[in-house]
């Protein structure tokens, strides 16, 4: 046991000599050793104390140095695997990943013309913001995506394909004193020669199919202020649910995509047709 803990090989005789030199009585045969310390050694209370005495007399500097070993291998979560697959898919489609701040301006949803009564205005407000531009937690990623696209356009970047995976935050509408709802979201932004509604749709389809989402439907949407009314669609998939009358198919909305409305694009300084999805 002593040799195993210390990682060394000391004979029983050597250990006995160490203990006896400290005026301890040793009994037992073979691997069993019973050690009785003198009454003055009140600090010797357990097996580990005896092992420490052997290490001290043997010489701490002689003990081998080893890296601690763990029994359990670290594993990556399913959520992380999904995000990594989404990243790999978008990069394979020629998109660059961007990262933007979670603290944003409430004017962002105004700029993309979100309805006044929309849940996307249920902000988590910062108590001590550095300024209005960082006074709330974001509920959507699209404003930040359009800002990045606008900066690239102002620097004469001919084409952009970008995506972001990030958290969004929303006040608990049932009880504002409770912790906010935090969700993962993804935004995509394209502009440039050859880009149109259908290239974005193809990228969205490829992404969702890679993530194992089948039975996709793109439902025309004319009332979403961010997008051109004739070039916008809600992204949905069919899921099977079991109701009182047995299995039922139900459409589950996953997101929205389309050509950004010219008025919205102008606010971000984008002077060409651009396309976004979230």
Provide a role label for each language-model segment.
Residues 1-278:
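Extended beta-strand-rich architecture
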């Amino acid at each position: 046991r002593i040799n195993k803990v210390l990682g060394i090989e000391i004979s029983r005789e050597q250990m006995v000599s160490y203990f006896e030199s400290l005026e301890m009585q040793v009994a037992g045969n073979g691997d069993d050793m019973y050690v009785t310390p003198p009454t003055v050694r009140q600090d010797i209370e357990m097996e580990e104390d005896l092992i420490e005495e052997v290490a001290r007399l043997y010489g701490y500097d002689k003990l081998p140095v080893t890296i601690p070993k763990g029994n359990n291998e670290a594993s990556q979560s399913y959520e992380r695997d999904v995000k990594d697959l989404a990243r790999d898919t978008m990069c394979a489609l020629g998109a660059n990943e961007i990262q933007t701040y979670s603290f944003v301006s409430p004017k962002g949803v105004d700029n993309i013309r979100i309805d006044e009564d929309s849940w996307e205005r249920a902000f988590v407000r910062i108590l001590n913001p550095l300024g209005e531009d960082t006074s709330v937690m974001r509920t959507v990623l699209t404003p930040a995506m359009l800002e990045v696209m606008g900066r690239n356009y102002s620097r004469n970047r001919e084409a952009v394909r970008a995506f972001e995976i990030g958290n969004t935050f929303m006040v608990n509408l049932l009880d504002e004193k409770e912790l906010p709802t935090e969700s993962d979201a993804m935004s995509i932004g394209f502009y440039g020669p050859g880009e149109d509604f259908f290239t974005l749709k193809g990228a969205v389809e490829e992404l969702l199919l890679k993530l194992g989402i089948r039975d996709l439907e793109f439902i025309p949407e004319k009332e979403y202020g961010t997008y051109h009314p004739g070039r916008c669609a809600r992204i949905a998939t069919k899921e099977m649910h079991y109701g009182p009358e047995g299995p039922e198919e139900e459409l589950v909305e996953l997101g929205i995509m389309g050509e950004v409305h010219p008025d919205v694009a102008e606010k971000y300084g984008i002077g060409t047709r651009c396309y976004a999805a979230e």
